[in-house]
């Protein structure tokens, strides 16, 4: 039991040491993205951005250009010796479709219409086979029984009756 409490305390201490002591605000003005700090901003990785006249504000560029990166603020008035980092990741989908109720209804209606047209095409194609006669024509083309089978002679004592020529049948 002591090992589990020690392990949970160790995990908690590790997680708390990674928590930022202060927040770094991200602003969106019109179509641009800005990172604000009380003191100074340091670029770590990603979009470099442009420092404005005061070094407390970093312009990351237009939202539509997907700004992303990691930035560090070097302390605030309260936390002078602390550093805090923020990760910015914008994903502007330029070729996406907004799925409002009208768009979803349009997709469903066009899907039903396309399915019905496909079913109609299959029905028309499968319903009219070319080169095949109807069922009535099949029965007329059959041969009569007399022409296909040879009649057996009167029953003999042999195990099987002998097949002979076209003898007259006894009816």
Swiss-Prot record:
One GO process term, biological-process aspect: positive thymic T cell selection
CDD domains according to UniProt: IgC1_CD3_gamma_delta (cd07691)
Superkingdom classification of source: Eukaryota
Topological domains annotated Cytoplasmic: 127-171
InterPro entries per record: CD3_esu/gsu/dsu (IPR015484), Ig-like_dom_sf (IPR036179), Ig-like_fold (IPR013783), Ig_4 (IPR032052), Phos_immunorcpt_sig_ITAM (IPR003110)
Domain ITAM: 138-166
Modified residues (Phosphotyrosine): 149, 160
Topology in membrane: Single-pass type I membrane protein
GO cellular component, one term: clathrin-coated endocytic vesicle membrane
Keyword Glycoprotein: yes
Disulfide bridge positions per record: 37-73
Chief place where the protein resides: membrane
Oligomeric form and interacting partners: The TCR-CD3 complex is composed of a CD3D/CD3E and a CD3G/CD3E heterodimers that preferentially associate with TCRalpha and TCRbeta, respectively, to form TCRalpha/CD3E/CD3G and TCRbeta/CD3G/CD3E trimers. In turn, the hexamer interacts with CD3Z homodimer to form the TCR-CD3 complex. Alternatively, TCRalpha and TCRbeta can be replaced by TCRgamma and TCRdelta. Interacts with coreceptors CD4 and CD8.
Name this protein carries in UniProt: T-cell surface glycoprotein CD3 delta chain
Gene coding for it: CD3D
């Amino acid at each position: 039991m002591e090992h589990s409490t020690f392990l949970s305390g160790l995990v908690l201490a590790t997680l708390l040491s990674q928590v930022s002591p202060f927040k770094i605000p991200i602003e969106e003005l019109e179509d641009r993205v800005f990172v604000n700090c009380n003191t100074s901003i340091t670029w770590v990785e990603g979009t470099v951005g442009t420092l404005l006249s005061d070094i407390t504000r970093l312009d990351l560029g237009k939202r539509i250009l997907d700004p992303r990166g990691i930035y560090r603020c070097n302390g605030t008035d309260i936390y002078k010796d602390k550093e805090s980092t923020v990760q910015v990741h914008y994903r502007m989908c330029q070729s996406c479709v907004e799925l409002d109720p009208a768009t979803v209804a349009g997709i469903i209606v066009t899907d039903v219409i396309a399915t019905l047209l496909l079913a109609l095409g299959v029905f028309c194609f499968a319903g009219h086979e070319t080169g095949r006669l109807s069922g009535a024509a099949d029965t007329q083309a059959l041969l009569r029984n007399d022409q296909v089978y040879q009649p057996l002679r009167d029953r003999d004592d042999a195990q099987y009756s002998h097949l002979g020529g076209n003898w007259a049948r006894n009816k």
